[in-house]
Curated annotation (Swiss-Prot):
Function text: This protein binds to the 23S rRNA, and is important in its secondary structure. It is located near the subunit interface in the base of the L7/L12 stalk, and near the tRNA binding site of the peptidyltransferase center.
This protein's UniProt keywords: Ribonucleoprotein, Ribosomal protein, RNA-binding, rRNA-binding
GO CC annotations on file: cytosolic large ribosomal subunit
Coiled-coil segments: none
Transmembrane portions of the chain: none
Zinc listed as a keyword: no
Record-level Gene Ontology MF annotations: rRNA binding; structural constituent of ribosome
Gene, per the UniProt record: rpl6
Protein name as annotated: Large ribosomal subunit protein uL6
Family indicated by similarity: Belongs to the universal ribosomal protein uL6 family.
Taxonomy, superkingdom: Archaea
The organism of origin for this protein: Hyperthermus butylicus (strain DSM 5456 / JCM 9403 / PLM1-5)
GO terms for biological process, alphabetical: cytoplasmic translation
Amino acid sequence: MAKAVYVAEEVRVPEGVEVSIDGLKVTVKGPKGELTRDFSHARNIVIRLDEDEEGKKVVVEAYFANRRVKALVGTIAAHIENMITGVTKGFRYKLKIVYSHFPVTVKVQGDKVVIENFLGEKAPRIAKIMPGVTVKVQKDDVIVEGIDIEAVGQTAANIEQATKVKDKDRRVFIDGIYIYEKGVAE
């Protein structure tokens, strides 16, 4: 398979966002906070900060890249884009509390979500909240917000997984907490 001589992806840096690059460690500061990510596992890749007439941009590039390195360039550029979106707007996941017979009670206690009376169970089910994420319960909705897309997504997945029904017909036992909307918080 032929190697590409030069592969590059550009990510624009908007006003009010500060990006610093130390080798393969990228730090993004914005109005909502600061995110740092280490890409040192990505060999043969260069991350640098450039400036042109349109403003600042982060360039992720590689020379003589095979298919794996090409994919890695795009992945790292997407991660940096998500970091910039996170510190400017943030991310929000919305989950719906669904129950048919036993009324489910959902409470936030410190760094965990406690789900009580799920399918009439005596013991509460517990889902972990990742660091830097806020969880709010409003009637039948659970709102998960934060600046790190991976932490927000993992927290929402933890809540959804905690209410998984095993050994029963999913068409009959529809109880659970389900993700129904995800996106940018604004």
